[in-house]
Design a protein with these regions (language model features):
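Conserved GNAT acetyl-CoA-binding A-motif
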Residues: 116-128
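A short, internal acetyl-CoA/4′-phosphopantetheine-binding micro-motif in the GNAT/acyltransferase core
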Residues: 92-101, 127-128
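Conserved beta-strand in the GNAT
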Residues: 68, 74-82, 89-92
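Conserved N-terminal entry element of GNAT/NAT acetyltransferase domains
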Residues: 1-20, 160-181
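A short helix-loop-beta-strand connector motif used in the catalytic cores of GNAT acetyltransferases and
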Residues: 55-68, 77
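Conserved active-site alpha-helix within GNAT-family acetyltransferase domains
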Residues: 106, 129-146
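Conserved acetyl-CoA-binding loop-helix of GNAT-fold acetyltransferases
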Residues: 101-114, 139
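Conserved GNAT-fold acetyl-CoA-binding loop/helix
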Residues: 33-56
Length: 181
């Protein structure tokens, strides 16, 4: 993945995440999600969130894409996705406040939606109900197909894939991936 000349000109660069980035990942996750964890999950308890996010970080190291976003050499965000045989999932976009709405969001969403069309695989993601990034996902064509107590479940390109189960709708797709045969 290569950044646009515009983003490079603004001082942005990308690097693959490695084991040494775990603390930075937890810091950025705290900056981006603490208010939602406080709102929906009885508060950000540091010890518990460190365990959860360290585990998440190590799983993400195995994803198809897990990169850090740098501004003049300083890590200011991270993004990830994981391509599976029948979908693109584990979507994550974490940006600190100073770099939000500077074009990184559009770059990342443009990249994964183009990939989805190219490989004919739907994208699935979860977004906190009160997170305003939901509107950006909608702008890029994501649709809410369900919800939990805390999240909207969104999809992109689900209607235009080679998924043989697609005719029966998203519920059957979700059942197929969640129920082991």
């Amino acid at each position: 993945m290569v950044l646009s000349e515009d983003l490079i000109g603004k001082g942005f660069s990308l690097q693959n995440v490695d084991e040494q980035d775990v603390e930075k990942y937890i810091d950025i996750k705290r900056i981006c999600h603490k208010k939602y964890v406080d709102e929906y999950n009885d508060g950000w308890i540091e010890d518990i969130q460190t365990i959860i996010n360290t585990d998440s970080f190590h799983r993400m190291l195995k994803y198809s894409c897990f990169q850090k976003i740098l501004l003049y050499g300083t890590t200011v965000g991270l993004f990830a996705y994981n391509e599976h045989p029948d979908k693109i999932g584990e979507i994550s976009l974490l940006l600190t406040e100073p770099v939000r709405k500077k074009g990184i969001e559009a770059f990342y969403l443009g990249h994964i939606t183009a990939l989805s069309r190219q490989v004919s695989k739907p994208i699935f993601l979860n977004v906190y109900k009160t997170d305003p990034v939901r509107d950006l996902y909608k702008h890029f064509g994501f649709k809410i197909y369900d919800q939990s107590r805390t999240h909207y479940l969104m999809s992109f390109n689900q209607d235009h894939t080679n998924d043989i189960y697609n005719a029966n709708g998203i519920r059957n797709y979700m059942n197929r991936i969640l129920i082991k045969e």
